[in-house]
């Protein structure tokens, strides 16, 4: 995405190192990456991207691992060390310097051709755009093209250095969130402090993602490549370092990506994207922390492998036709790390595929090489391809997959992406790798770049591709989209990475995993570009959330969600390289000729189709909403007209039934009901006005009308709407029945109080008192309270509840306490003897606590009314109560019983409810006491 500002590099590689090119990206994360690069390998010269078009394609970011400098110059000039942009493959310690030189020479030559393709096809500041379709890598780029690419890359870098709309609300919010996520992820990984020193080679994968700052578009869009690539056991090693650097550079890149998404992506609103991206970043950050820890613990060679894959990827990008030779040599030179990069040679076999596909694959390969999740996948695929060091194999295999899928075709596009990758290698690599994985599925070689196993890659890659795509989705999409959005013409690499990977991921997961690379690539280039652009954030996040949890998700190649997106896109499968440059592809006609070089079918359509299709989708969506609204609006006026003119129409017609029937069909059940009601009225009135026969008819109808006024709506509905009307009529009848029942129930409630003289009192007492005591109190005591209650009940309206509630407060507690002891005595003697024991029992209760005496008083109150009913008992009980309690207690109990009842009479409903509840509450308390 970010074209490094590089002087026209010599066509011949300088010791496998690209000529130094300076990225003008004052990014803090970028600087940190540079520091890491210097610390990790002071000897290496960072590869610079020749240009957004040329550099991305040619991007061979080379980084020397300890002894050997990774010379992945795909014709790309060296990047200044300060840039901190080092190829993930730079840590290839196994590769010899001579091998690097060979690669550099081969790759550089290829880059020339790719750059020429890129520069010539893209008239606008579209080195990115031109690179995307740059299918003919064989053609050498002229120095003018290189200069143009440099200028374009400088412009892009300047733009990227300062977010285009940093003041936008969405960007600010996203930046805050991303900072939080980065703090969490980097701190958890311990990479902020570790990046410069601890992660030298290991960080190279991460520093490559860290390089993403220069390449912020691709790096940001690949902010969390590591987690998506978790599927492979070694993905944590890569993903973690890559993520730290990516996180650091994500702040600028993700913000730009969000802006781009807002402008280009219709499906995913900015807020939604930010939320999803933040969730992915958080989830990926966890994965990255784990992965980084694993990577740090794991031997240095895996990081070296990661770097070497990046170099290979860049080389592959640089040389579409020479990709086979150079990547093959590279893979043979670096069995562990080179293989990943060698995949581009393997991909060379599918060179027939459009260059854009190769570019995607190579950029993806670079991303995996950066030390992002791809490492884990490569290990799985490596088993298929070559026996390499486990960590190295894994990463290499990932790169292989990416490059193999579209070796020659993808080279131009991928080199474009590679150019972006140098600045943000790990993030871009993650994102790119995911798209490459998808593209690669048919051609991706499983682990052996040396073997050029395009066939094998096609067979084995699908699994690997899914895994890598998943990783890529996490971070890179945001970066790439961000870059593309703010600028009408975005760096093709960054945009292609962001847009491609989601699309490729979806397409490959759902559709493309089995599909062969070459045919799918042309499909990619055409319309999927735009669709991919809109989809990338959602699909990437979704895929990442689903896949990242387990390395097992690699089979997600069969993942359904991405296919749905593919379905949404007319050419969803294989717009990966187009995806990143939807905007610029449209702007640049050159990409069309480039795509036509390898497969001109899809590329021109994709360019023109991206903006047009996006506009069409937007327009179609808007039209859909308006269309839905319009039908809603039209029926409403019709209903109004029908309702208003129903009477007139019916009058005009001798019989309004026909009109009514017609109207209900058009308007619906409810509308028909309203209209039908006037219809019978009209029928009656015109019948009366008509001649004698109509009068007879009116007489016949009149009874119907009389009977109908209530059922009319139902009958009319039944006539007009059928089942609907019948159901409606049934509902109405049921409602009426229920209403009647409720009215009947209310009188029943009123009736209940009248019999309450006997039953209600018993009902009230049993609810309040324990079972045994209820029986005892019912006969003697309840009748007089019933009379008292009845007197109060009619006043309150609800007689039962009040008396029960009033006693329950006072009587229930004492009864409950005494009930177990008194039940035997009281049940047998209901006369004064039970009252006395009750008083005796109450006496001990009084000292026990304040509550028992109050209940005791109410209890005698109950007994006292019962006794009062029978004069003999009255005399007995007061005497019995008075000696233990004293003269005060006996009067207090009746006073409390009577006065509170009289006072509480107005509270019947509340008292009844509370009484039942309180009785239950009191029982346990007294029993426990």
Curated annotation (Swiss-Prot):
Compositional bias annotation for Pro residues: 1-12, 224-234
Chain residue ranges for the region called Disordered: 1-260, 285-389, 509-558, 589-610, 630-726, 740-763, 826-916
InterPro entries: Synaptopodin_domain
GO cellular component: actin cytoskeleton; bicellular tight junction; cytosol; dendritic spine; glutamatergic synapse; nucleus; perikaryon; plasma membrane
Disulfide feature: none
Known tissue expression: Expressed in cerebral cortex.
Subunit description: Interacts with BAIAP1. Interacts with actin. Interacts (via PPxY motifs) with WWC1 (via WW domains).
Protein name (Swiss-Prot/TrEMBL): Synaptopodin
Organism listed in the record: Homo sapiens (Human)
Gene: SYNPO
